[in-house]
A protein has these predicted regions:
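C-terminal regulatory/oligomerization modules of transcriptional regulators
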Residues: 1-10, 60, 64, 134, ...
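N-terminal leader segment of winged-helix/HTH proteins
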Residues: 1-44
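Membrane-interacting alpha-helical segments
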Residues: 8-15, 98-103, 156-158
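Pre-recognition alpha-helix immediately N-terminal to the DNA-recognition helix
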Residues: 17, 48-52, 108
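N-terminal helix-turn-helix DNA-binding core of bacterial DNA-binding proteins
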Residues: 32-79, 84
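Short alpha-helix boundary/capping elements
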Residues: 57-58, 91-92, 144
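Charged, amphipathic alpha-helical coiled-coil/dimerization segments
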Residues: 85-138
Length: 158
């Protein structure tokens, strides 16, 4: 499949169709997220780092977490390490014996953000078909994986 039709429009390349729709959704959702984060007093990077820690069960070896954080946020190892260290110094994470974990203050902040996003977006999510959401998430994950594989080896060597 190299072309697609959207809402009766002429056929356009699949990448262009996906890029336009994802770009529009990202712009709108990023602005809404920024509002919630501002109300919570958090940065986007802090929020994303706390979300990534959730994937690790709220604790991980520091080096493994920094590598994972760098990969997911597309940061070099130095920047990912600086981000992790700043979260420790802010009291949102704790570091002990090379294990980094979410601190109670971080858990409270993440929950406040989660509630804010949930309250704001609930009317939108309620209108979506769960099967469509599942397909969209699966497709975007696959696109992300395939696109990451296109990066030069040197770019991926963090």
């Amino acid at each position: 499949m190299t072309e697609t039709r959207t809402e009766g429009a002429p056929a356009i390349p699949v990448g262009m169709a996906i890029g336009q729709v994802v770009g529009q959704a990202e712009t709108v959702l990023t602005k809404l997220l920024a509002r919630v984060l501002a109300e919570a007093g958090a940065t986007r990077e802090t929020y994303l780092a706390m979300q990534r820690m959730l994937v690790h069960g709220d604790e991980a070896g520091r080096d493994a977490y920094v590598r994972d954080l760098g990969d997911w946020l597309d940061l070099d190892l130095w920047s990912a390490g600086e981000l992790a260290d700043s979260l420790v110094s802010e009291g949102l994470f704790r570091l002990a014996h090379e294990t980094i974990r979410l601190a109670p203050a971080g858990a409270e902040l993440r929950e406040r953000i989660r509630r804010g996003i949930g309250d704001l977006m609930a009317p939108v999510w309620e209108q979506l078909d769960p099967a469509d959401v599942e397909t969209t998430v699966r497709t975007l994950r696959r696109v992300t994986t395939l696109a990451r594989d296109l990066r030069p080896a040197a770019d991926g060597a963090r």
